[in-house]
């Protein structure tokens, strides 16, 4: 079923932004593993223990799903057809003028962050491109899609 799911600012397949860890686990019928990304345990990044969602990560802030990240090529795409491996040019054509571009924090140009906001700083999709101009990671969800190093 994951092959037909779209990654949107609202979620992925049956998974919705705002769900608890248990709700996400039940929706996917898979155990989530991972660890806290901060000392307080308020930010956790988890991944499915197996199955078709390899390279998918779920960020929980204060117990609620805030971001879904896809970091490996596969079947999952945005509703506009963008996937890990798409070119920055394909992202620009798909999302048009509403796309915000900024330089990547750790990789030289042409690597960049291309962000599409459904509602500014509240819900959106961020495409992280690499030095080859291709999408390396897609983040979708709340304003946490802007976080560069885990929860920071």
Mark where each language-model region is:
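Mid-length scaffold segments of soluble, non-membrane domains
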Residues: 68-71, 81-84
């Amino acid at each position: 079923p994951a092959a037909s799911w779209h990654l949107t600012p609202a979620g992925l397949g049956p998974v919705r932004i705002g769900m608890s860890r248990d709700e996400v686990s039940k929706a996917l019928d898979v155990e989530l593993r991972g660890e806290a990304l901060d000392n307080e345990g308020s930010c956790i990044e988890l991944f499915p223990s197996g199955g078709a969602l390899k390279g998918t990560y779920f960020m929980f802030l204060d117990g609620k799903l805030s971001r879904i990240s896809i970091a490996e090529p596969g079947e999952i795409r945005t509703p506009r057809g963008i996937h890990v491996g798409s070119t920055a040019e394909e992202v620009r054509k798909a999302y048009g003028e509403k796309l915000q571009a900024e330089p990547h924090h750790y990789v030289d140009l042409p690597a960049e962050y291309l962000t599409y906001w459904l509602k500014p700083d509240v819900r959106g999709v961020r495409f992280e491109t690499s030095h080859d101009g291709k999408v390396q990671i897609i983040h979708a969800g709340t304003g946490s899609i802007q976080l560069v190093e885990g929860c920071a």
